[in-house]
Amino acid sequence: MTVFNPVWRVKIQGVEYTTYTLSNLTITSGRNNIYQQAQAGYCNLELLNLTQAIVNIHINDSVSIELQDSTATYVPIFGGTVVDFGVEIITAGSVGINQVLKITALGALSRLPKALTDGVLSQDFDGDQIYEILQDLLLNNWGEVPAALQWQNYDPSETWANAQNVGLGEIDRPGNYELAQRSSDRTDVYSLVSALATSGLGYIYEDASGLISYADSTHRSIYLATNGYTDVTANHALFNGLKIETRAGDVRNDITLKYNTNSNNEVSAEDIPSIDVYGRLAQVITTTVKHTVDAQDQADFYLTLRATPQANFTSITYQLTNPELDDADRDSLINVFMGLPLRISDLPPNMASGTFLGFVEGWSFKAAYNEIAVTLNLSPISYSLQAMKWEQVPIGESWNTITGALTWETALVVA
C-alpha cells in the first residue's frame, strides 16, 4: 500500500502560484472516439485566495499544470492559454474575505480553427504536409518576432530552432501515405490539418505540455512493439460507472473512399457476410491520398477491422489517492497520453472476457483538495494497428516472435 497526497505546481505566464490552494480542477484531453480528430484540451481551474492579493493574470497568458509522481518529479498534465479569468468572493465576515480565482484555459489546438491558410501544398507524405501547414503558424520567423523582445529575456542555452516555437510538438515525418498536391483554397487550419491526418490514417493531438503533434498510421504499432502494454487492474478502479459498449454505429461494412486531388476519384470495398448479419452500413471517407493502391489499402483496412462490432471501453476511473494503487500504476496513469496501450485485467468475466486491450483515446482529470481521479476512454487495439515498414521494426524484435506463415504485407503488431 502506498499513500499518495497530490502535490501541484501551477504556473501562469511562467509565474508559480505557490501561495494559493488548488480547490477544484477539471482537465479534459484527447477525443471521445476513434472516428474523430482530437479537440483542444480544456482546463477549469480554481485557486483559493485568502489574502486578497493583486493577481496579475490576463487573457492569452500561458498555463501549465504539473503533478508530482511517486519520485517527487513534477509531471506536466496540461498546457494551454487563459481564455477566461474571474475573481469571486466565496465567504466574507469579520475575520476577512475569501476569494476564488476561476481560470479557464484551452490547449494549442484551439488556435487552429481561428487561423486561416491558403493551404498550398506540393505532393508529399502526410507528416510532411501537416508540418508544412503547422510550422507556418506555430514557428515564428525573424519578421514575426515581437519588436520589444530583448535577448536578455531568453535562456542563454536557447536555440533559434525552438526559441519562437509557440505550439509545435512532435510531428511524425515523413508519414506513410503520399498525398496529392493542393492548390490555393482558403480554409481554417484545423479543418485542413484534420483532413490531412485522416488521409494519412493518423491523428493530431496535444502533448502534456499543450504542443500540437501528429501521429502517423504506424505510430501506435511501433510504440506497442517497442514498449509493450501498460498493465493495470480493474480491481483498483472505481467499479461504479465502469462501462464497456458494443455499438452497431461502430460497424462499417460498405466503404467508399474518395482520393486524389480534390478527392475526385474513389474506390470501394464491402463485406457481404457482415451485410447479411447487420445490414448495409455504409460510410464515405474523404481523403487526398494520391495513389489508387494506397486508397484501396485504406478502404480494405477500414473494412477488415470494422465489419464486425467490437467492445469500446467508454469509461473507467482510477482514484489516484487510492492506497491500494501501487506507485508504478499511479505514475503510468499520471503520464497518460493519447495512444497509450493499456491492458486492463480483472474485469468481470462478462466484460471483454475479463481483460481489455486498447489504446487511450481521451481522458479527464478531476481534482479537489487532496483528491484526484482520472477517467479514461479506450478503443479496441485492432482499430489502430497498422503494418509497419521494414525500417520501422524495432531493433529488439526477435524472429522467433513472428509466425512462419505470416506475410509481411499483412503483418500487424499484436505483442
Annotate each PLM feature.
Residues A40-Y42, L137, L333:
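Conserved long hydrophobic alpha-helices within structured protein cores
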Residues T71-T81, P348-F359:
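Short coil-to-beta-strand transition motifs
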Residues H58-S62, R186, F337-S345:
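Glycine-centered loop/turn motifs
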Residues L48-L50, I65-D69, F85-T91, W142-E144, ...:
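Short regulatory "switch" loops immediately downstream of catalytic or recognition motifs
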Residues L45, A105, L196, L257, ...:
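Terminal peptide-recognition signature
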Residues D69-Y74, T91-T246:
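Charged- and aromatic-enriched interaction segments used to assemble
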Residues M1-D128, A368-A373, I381-L385:
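Beta-strand-rich assembly/attachment modules of structural machines
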Residues M1-T18, S122-Y131, Q135, S191-L357, ...:
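Acidic, small/polar-enriched beta strand-loop surface segments
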